[in-house]
UniProtKB/Swiss-Prot annotation:
Pfam families: Fapy_DNA_glyco, H2TH, zf-FPG_IleRS. Belongs to the FPG family. This is Formamidopyrimidine-DNA glycosylase. It comes from the Bacteria. SMART domains: Fapy_DNA_glyco, H2TH. Binds 1 zinc ion per subunit. Involved in base excision repair of DNA damaged by oxidation or by mutagenic agents. Acts as a DNA glycosylase that recognizes and removes damaged bases. Has a preference for oxidized purines, such as 7,8-dihydro-8-oxoguanine (8-oxoG). Has AP (apurinic/apyrimidinic) lyase activity and introduces nicks in the DNA strand. Cleaves the DNA backbone by beta-delta elimination to generate a single-strand break at the site of the removed base with both 3'- and 5'-phosphates. One of its GO terms (biological process) is base-excision repair. NCBIfam families: fpg, PRK01103.1. It comes from Rhodococcus opacus (strain B4). DNA binds at H96, R115, K161. It catalyses: Hydrolysis of DNA containing ring-opened 7-methylguanine residues, releasing 2,6-diamino-4-hydroxy-5-(N-methyl)formamidopyrimidine; 2'-deoxyribonucleotide-(2'-deoxyribose 5'-phosphate)-2'-deoxyribonucleotide-DNA = a 3'-end 2'-deoxyribonucleotide-(2,3-dehydro-2,3-deoxyribose 5'-phosphate)-DNA + a 5'-end 5'-phospho-2'-deoxyribonucleoside-DNA + H(+). Its EC number is 3.2.2.23, 4.2.99.18.
């Protein structure tokens, strides 16, 4: 599923193309796309119609549109395959179009989702740590690209856990936006195995992992994110190309760019982890999972 850079690419596109526009009408074309909005399709369409899109915001992987004059946000769940496309209305309807919003700017905002894990929902905005976020996102920590991300405080929280460092990196209540791809890339850059226990790592080593996560996600963002298939696209339907720059993730049996040792794939939390067995020494005894 998309991680921080991919979601930020979408957010920037929405900010560029639809912020300032008002919603003239909304067509709900598949019930699963609004299943998180419990009052139903008519309520969602009714509340959105006439609203002005005042902003496009994000925290970690969570994306939402700020609406005026209401005090609610449109939370967009991209799921595994969700796309937010800004299209001229005369373009043919996409095969997996789930929601279409007609804007007064003359454009369509289209939510396309092949696997139907994503969707739209309205949520009230609440203040958390000096920022307004949807109440459904209130428990999510700041991400490494947030201007108010506190590296030292996050290092302290991470070190206070008794868990594998990769597991903690994936915990969105500790630090948000990092998924499997960028966790593996950050750990490779910091030369730390994902099974290392956080309370056995020094503060500087944990800081190195988080700094590496910042760096790799900034680089991915500059390349439009990581696209492994046609489902990961920006608002214009274009794919990113950071997958060409990955050092560890998905590189099983290929030489480590640093030392030449074959990258190894291991099972972790019902997914795959990729690491260099030489640069990232595994602990003698892997913690029970």
């Amino acid at each position: 599923m998309p991680e921080l850079p991919e979601v930020e690419v979408v957010r920037r596109g929405l900010e560029r193309h639809i912020v300032g526009a008002s919603i003239d009408s909304v067509d709900i074309l598949h019930p699963r796309a609004i299943r998180r909005h419990l009052p139903g399709a008519a309520d969602l369409a009714g509340q959105l119609t006439g609203e002005r899109i005042a902003g496009a915001d994000r925290r970690g992987k969570y994306l939402w549109l700020v609406l005026e004059p209401s005090t609610v946000a449109l939370v967009v769940h991209l799921g595994m395959s969700g796309q937010m496309l800004v299209q001229p209305p005369e373009l043919p309807t996409e095969k997996h179009l789930r929601i279409r919003a007609r804007l007064d700017s003359g454009l369509d905002l289209r939510f396309v989702d092949q696997r139907t894990f994503g969707g739209w929902a309205l949520a009230p905005l609440v203040e958390v740590d000096g920022s307004l976020v949807p109440d459904s996102v209130a428990h999510i920590a700041r991400d490494p690209l947030d201007s108010r991300f506190d590296l030292a405080a996050t290092v302290k929280v991470v070190r206070g856990k008794h868990s594998e460092i990769k597991r903690v990196l994936l915990d969105q209540t500790v630090v948000s936006g990092i998924g499997n791809i960028y966790a593996d890339e950050a750990l490779w850059r910091a030369q730390i195995h994902g099974n290392r226990l956080t309370d056995r790592l020094t503060g500087p080593r944990i800081g190195a992992v988080l700094t590496a996560a910042q760096q790799v996600m900034r680089e991915a963002l500059s390349q439009g994110g990581t696209s492994f298939d046609a489902l990961y696209v920006n608002v214009n339907g274009e794919s990113g190309y950071f997958d060409r720059s990955l050092s560890a993730y998905g590189q099983e049996d290929r030489p480590c760019p640093r030392c030449g040792t074959a990258i190894r794939r291991e099972k972790f939390m019902n997914r795959s982890s990729f690491s260099c067995p030489k640069c990232q020494r595994a602990p003698r005894r892997s913690p029970a999972r």
